[in-house]
Amino acid sequence: MGTAALGAELGVRVLLFVAFLVTELLPPFQRRIQPEELWLYRNPYVEAEYFPTGRMFVIAFLTPLSLIFLAKFLRKADATDSKQACLAASLALALNGVFTNIIKLIVGRPRPDFFYRCFPDGLAHSDLTCTGDEDVVNEGRKSFPSGHSSFAFAGLAFASFYLAGKLHCFTPQGRGKSWRLCAFLSPLLFAAVIALSRTCDYKHHWQDVLVGSMIGMTFAYVCYRQYYPPLTDVECHKPFQDKHKLPSSQKPSELHHLEI
């Protein structure tokens, strides 16, 4: 990949990041809440979360990044592999953030703890006009889909796909070795724990978590496949660009394959 092409790739990610920041600041649609449905949003307002936003972002971003550099260190993968993996992971996370935020703003679904965000004293007005802090109330209208769930799966599912490719979990030479399958599933389990914790914190309904998880996993897989072949491919451990520049005299199995 030339300098111009790399610059264009990075530019796309910068624009997506800016779009993410802008959508973070916009107010959501104020969906009308009927008195008979208030029970859905009357769960306690919990400030101590199992996975605070900062911790979730660290996990979602650093897990795939750590695996990329660990693979390079342990298997002596070339710079092209690491660069393509970083581009794929960053694209998945950036696209996920923009799409998740836009859907949140359009839907404007109240969180399970919205009642106590809207009425901190627990006393609802007859016209249901909120008396709570405006920022807290607006954040309470961003339940669907779950951002924690989508980011967790965007980052950790990508890590799973990357591991599966490097370990050949789904090719003939990698099947039948249970530790490889466990390694592939571990990040997905961690992502599920983060996602489900949002229902325990009363920050999301189960539908928010389910759809958010699906969004994150979809972007993780789509972006992974933009740079890497299918996980059933015998050369799934190599990015497309690396395969294109492979000398015809070199056997595919000689590059970046871990035999255990």
From Swiss-Prot:
Region (Phosphatase sequence motif III): 197-207
Pfam family, one: PAP2
Pathway listed: Lipid metabolism; phospholipid metabolism
Catalyzed chemical reaction(s): a 1,2-diacyl-sn-glycerol 3-diphosphate + H2O = a 1,2-diacyl-sn-glycero-3-phosphate + phosphate + H(+); a 1,2-diacyl-sn-glycero-3-phosphate + H2O = a 1,2-diacyl-sn-glycerol + phosphate; 1,2-dioctanoyl-sn-glycero-3-diphosphate + H2O = 1,2-dioctanoyl-sn-glycero-3-phosphate + phosphate + H(+); 1,2-dioctanoyl-sn-glycero-3-phosphate + H2O = 1,2-dioctanoyl-sn-glycerol + phosphate
Bilayer topology annotation: Multi-pass membrane protein
Transmembrane annotation, as ranges: 51-71, 87-107, 151-171, 176-196, 206-223
EC class name: hydrolase
Protein name (Swiss-Prot/TrEMBL): Phospholipid phosphatase 5
